[in-house]
From Swiss-Prot:
Cited CDD domains: cytochrome_b_C, Cytochrome_b_N
Protein name: Cytochrome b
Transmembrane segments annotated in the record for this chain: 34-54, 78-99, 114-134, 179-199, 227-247, 289-309, 321-341, 348-368
Disulfide linkage: none
Name of the encoding gene: MT-CYB
Length: 380
């Protein structure tokens, strides 16, 4: 009998073991769909990004008009740009839900998978930041100025780092050129890191909503989860297309329709919505270096998740107190996101400071304490 090519061919065998005959827990819910959705987001962003790059000019005198030209004169250029800009928002929605799922169900106990995931998040944030600068509108320019300037808070070496990053003494043509180079490179780095993330995941197999070993009850990935994933693709691509077609500028900043002008500062400098929670934490500390450290800590704190796990149970499925705390943390992040979009004045300053304290307090102290209490309650 001839060998099955799918199982014997060196490359097809790898694909088969990852996407077809992969043993998957039978009880994973729709919360496990976001990994594949992130893959589709990445693919969409790379394709639309490549098409945009063919019409873009990375020069301060031409960048803004080249983007306008793409939207006005290129066949479906407006659609490609709108899909790319809003695709970034969907990318972040999916990654935040994916991280939330991992946090709720204790997936962070697969340490290597979790750590590569956090590195992926950081790379995605860097990609989105440099990408936002490329249209060279007012918010692009001032966003780049404000965020790169944060590095000057580091003692002794700070100013040198900033000027090195800028390629001069202010955000100018060299900055735009290198940001375009980085924005082109980073998505491919993300794709490479995704394969590493994938490799680590397939070493241990997927977690499941019960957080128990499911080796005795696994089903093949195809057709069960491949079909479920395709449903997920439809449910994500439909709102993305609707947003790109009906309200493409809903999540953007009107300030970015004005070409960059170093002599006019916008009244409210703020990043895209997906960075607002971190921006709120940055702003809530009156000291520059302190703010920068808090900003970094707000994301890097995810690396500590496996170390802060003290519960005897893996997931929060049967831990009502931790569940309450988890949803409080979600609400807290939504408050931070809202505060980040507001001007720096009373009462937003104090709300931001309280929400920032609560954010760190919840993750670093309240979760471990609650878990310890729940462990005690198990004995009754």
């Amino acid at each position: 009998m001839a060998p099955n090519l799918r199982k014997s061919h060196p490359i097809l065998k790898m694909i088969n073991n990852s996407l077809i005959d992969l043993p998957a827990p039978s009880n994973i819910s729709a919360w496990w769909n976001f990994g594949s959705l992130l893959g589709i987001c990445l693919l969409t962003q790379i394709i639309t990004g490549l098409l945009l790059a063919t019409h873009y000019t990375a020069d301060t005198t031409l960048a803004f008009s080249s983007v306008a030209h793409t939207c006005r004169n290129v066949q479906y250029g407006w659609l490609i740009r709108n899909l790319h800009a809003n695709g970034a928002s969907f990318f972040f929605i999916c990654i935040y839900l994916h991280i939330g799922r991992g946090f709720y169900y204790g997936s962070y106990l697969f340490k290597e998978t979790w750590n590569t995931g956090v590195i992926l998040l950081l790379t995605l944030m860097a990609t989105a930041f440099v990408g936002y600068v490329l249209p060279w509108g007012q918010m692009s320019f001032w966003g780049a100025t404000v965020i790169t300037n944060l590095f000057s808070a580091f003692p002794y070496i700070g100013q040198t780092i900033v000027e090195w990053a800028w390629g001069g003494f202010s955000v100018d043509n060299p900055t735009l050129t290198r940001f375009f180079a980085l924005h082109f490179l980073l998505p491919f780095m993300i794709a490479g890191l995704t394969l590493i993330h994938f490799t680590f995941l397939h070493e241990s197999g997927s977690n499941n909503p019960l957080g128990i070993v499911s080796d005795c009850d696994k089903i093949p990935f195809h057709p069960y989860f491949s079909v479920k994933d395709i449903l997920g693709f439809m449910l994500m691509l439909l709102p993305l297309t609707a947003l790109a077609l009906f309200s493409p500028n809903l999540l953007g900043d009107p300030e970015n329709f004005t070409p960059a002008n170093p002599l006019v500062t916008p009244p409210h400098i703020k990043p895209e919505w997906y960075f607002l929670f971190a921006y709120a934490i940055l702003r809530s500390i009156p000291n520059k270096l302190g703010g920068v450290l808090a900003l970094a800590a707000s994301v890097l704190i995810l690396f500590l998740a496996p170390l802060l796990h003290v519960s005897k149970q893996r997931t929060m499925a049967f831990r009502p107190l931790s569940q309450l705390l988890f949803w409080t943390l979600v609400a807290n992040l939504l408050i931070l996101t809202w505060v980040g979009s507001q001007p720096v004045e009373h009462p937003f300053i104090i709300i931001g400071q309280l929400a920032s304290i609560t954010y760190f307090l919840t993750i670093l102290f309240l979760f471990p304490l609650t878990s310890a209490l729940e462990n005690k309650l198990l004995n009754f």
